[in-house]
Every structure is written in structure tokens, then in C-alpha cells.
């Protein structure tokens, strides 16, 4: 198992459009299926309720690390924190990084989630597996959101 998940997709939309879908909290909420309470700001917790069917009882909590307009967006979070009886705050978070580049057909969007080697061994493999599949789905979701199916 790797320490990182890497996914990419070329989206037939300008960088500015993909950037807005990625960093505007209302748009992010739509395609990521979460209802965020406030805009993304570096150093601030982005929190809200998951809206994906079957997971509505779970929270989305991510701390925004860096925003470089139309180029880079990152946050840290606890991967696959689905057990409401567990306090994940004592675990090291993973780092999620999005990069955007102009591409021949529009925008190349990449996501890298790293730091799985620091997740407790008892849940590392499942967190990795679930997030790997999750990022595959989310890349398709953002592409559909901006009007281009993968």
C-alpha cells in the first residue's frame, strides 16, 4: 500500500471555472455532497454535514492549509472517519492537495492525498481503500458539476 493517493482528470472547462467549483464553498458543497457552514480560508476549519445518502450522520471537518488562486488548494483532514464513537482528533491528519493546470482541452485537475503511513495501522488499509475510491468518484463529480462528464 502506498502512502498517497493520486488522481487526475482533464476537464473541458477553463481553469477559472474549475477553480470556482473547487474553492467556492457553495459549489464545493454541491459536487462533494457536503453542506459547509462557511467559506474556505487558510488556517480555518471548514466544517459541515455530509449530504451523501447513507452518510448524513457524519461531519466533514477539514482545515484549509493553503490557497493559491487558480493553481493550488490544500487542506488536512482525518480520512474515512465514519465511526461516531471514535475521536479521530488524536490521529495525524492526511494532506489533500489539488493542483490545476491549463490543458489542451481545458483544465488538468490533480488531487493527491498523502500521509496514510501515519494513520493507525488498525484502520490504515480501509481508510486508504475507501478514499482511493472516493477520490475517483469526486473527480467525476466535479467534472459533471462544471458541465463535462468524464
Feature-to-residue mapping (PLM):
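Hydrophobic pocket/interface hotspot
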Residues: 18, 28, 46-48, 64, ...
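Hydrophobic ligand-binding cavity/cleft-lining segments
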Residues: 1-37, 41
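Hydrophobic-ligand binding "helix-grip"
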Residues: 29, 36-39, 57-105
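Aromatic-glycine hotspot motif
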Residues: 1-15, 65-68, 90, 97, ...
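K/E-rich alpha-helical interaction surfaces of small helical-bundle regulatory domains
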Residues: 24-30, 69-70, 134-144
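Short, solvent-exposed aromatic-acidic interface loops
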Residues: 78-83, 112-119
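A solvent-exposed, acidic/Ser-Thr-rich amphipathic alpha-helical stretch
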Residues: 34-49, 53-57
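A conserved amphipathic terminal alpha-helix motif
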Residues: 115-150
Amino acid at each position: 500500500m502506498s502512502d498517497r493517493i493520486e488522481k487526475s482528470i482533464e476537464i473541458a472547462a477553463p481553469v477559472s471555472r474549475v477553480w470556482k467549483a473547487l474553492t467556492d464553498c457553495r459549489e464545493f458543497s454541491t459536487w462533494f455532497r457536503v453542506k459547509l457552514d462557511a467559506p474556505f480560508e487558510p488556517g480555518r476549519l471548514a466544517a459541515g454535514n455530509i449530504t451523501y445518502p447513507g452518510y448524513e450522520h457524519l461531519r466533514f471537518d477539514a482545515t484549509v492549509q493553503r490557497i493559491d488562486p487558480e493553481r493550488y488548494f490544500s487542506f488536512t483532514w482525518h480520512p474515512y472517519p465514519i465511526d461516531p464513537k471514535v475521536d479521530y482528533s488524536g490521529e495525524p491528519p492526511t494532506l489533500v492537495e489539488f493542483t490545476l493546470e491549463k490543458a489542451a482541452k481545458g483544465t488538468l485537475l490533480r488531487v493527491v492525498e498523502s500521509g496514510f503511513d501515519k494513520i493507525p495501522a488498525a484502520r490504515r488499509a480501509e481508510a486508504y481503500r475507501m478514499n482511493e475510491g472516493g477520490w475517483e468518484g469526486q473527480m467525476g463529480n466535479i467534472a459533471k458539476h462544471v458541465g463535462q462528464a468524464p
